Amino acid sequence: MEKQEAFSHWKQQSARKTDVSKKGSVDEDIEETVRLINQQERYFTTSSCSGRVIIINETLDNSTIQKQNCSWLFVTHKLCKPDDVFAALQNATGDVVLKFEPFVLHVQCRALEDAQLLHSVAINAGFRNSGITVGKKGKIIMAVRSTHGLEVPLTQNGKCLVSHEYIEFLVHTANKKMEENKRRITRFHSCLHKALQKEDCVHDKTSKEQASSCVYVRRRKRKDRSRKSNCSSSEEEHTDSEPELTLFNDP
């Protein structure tokens, strides 16, 4: 009971939090999926990204890698064009990297079996790198992840390292990965919807069977009490009649 109360508290806290992502809202391609998950009592999402092509300008030394030392030159959650990359490179001053980052979703789960259901759905949808972690405070997080990312350096110290033809090839490759990513998201949503429906049906069936069993037990108890009452009456009648029989047998 304490775990359920703690989970409910965490879910309420999450619902009140402001979205601190750069975009400030859930990505369009996964809005429906995030809504479906958050409608369930046993789940709530903590972070998400539908997948993106991003060009990052890293202005840092080789000894450290810190997120705050990176600037975004370009980002899109849709298909991109080579011209988008060429335009972004005009502002390059450091080491520029082109990345494709696939769909990622973190979901806090009420119980381990709830996380296992979500994990099974993710694996079947093609997100093979998905996993479950349990924190020190009992927080169960299910991460939906895959490995079909892409990361390629384009410049070093502001100098372009690759040809225009290669950049066009990279954009084509990133777009193919984005299309596959969207297919997996669609598959994940469909599998999740079916799995939740199946769970609800099993739960309803179990509840009905338990209710029916309780009614059956109550009926049996009433019948047993009735039988005992009838037996008691017969025994009383038999006991009362015994003296009369004895009297009739006296000489």
From Swiss-Prot:
Q: What class of enzyme is it?
A: transferase
Lineage: superkingdom? Eukaryota
The keyword Cell cycle belongs to this UniProt entry's keyword annotation: no
Pathway listed for it is: tRNA modification; wybutosine-tRNA(Phe) biosynthesis
Protein keywords: Methyltransferase, S-adenosyl-L-methionine, Transferase, tRNA processing
Catalytic function, reaction form: 4-demethyl-7-[(3S)-3-amino-3-carboxypropyl]wyosine(37) in tRNA(Phe) + S-adenosyl-L-methionine = 7-[(3S)-3-amino-3-carboxypropyl]wyosine(37) in tRNA(Phe) + S-adenosyl-L-homocysteine + H(+)
- The segment annotated Disordered runs over 1-23, 209-251
Q: What GO MF terms are annotated?
A: methyltransferase activity
Q: Which GO terms describe its biological process?
A: methylation; tRNA processing
Record's compositionally biased regions (Basic residues) = 217-228
EC code(s) of this entry: 2.1.1.282
Q: What does this protein do?
A: Probable S-adenosyl-L-methionine-dependent methyltransferase that acts as a component of the wybutosine biosynthesis pathway. Wybutosine is a hyper modified guanosine with a tricyclic base found at the 3'-position adjacent to the anticodon of eukaryotic phenylalanine tRNA.
- Give the family, as the similarity comment puts it: Belongs to the TYW3 family.
Q: What is this protein called?
A: tRNA wybutosine-synthesizing protein 3 homolog
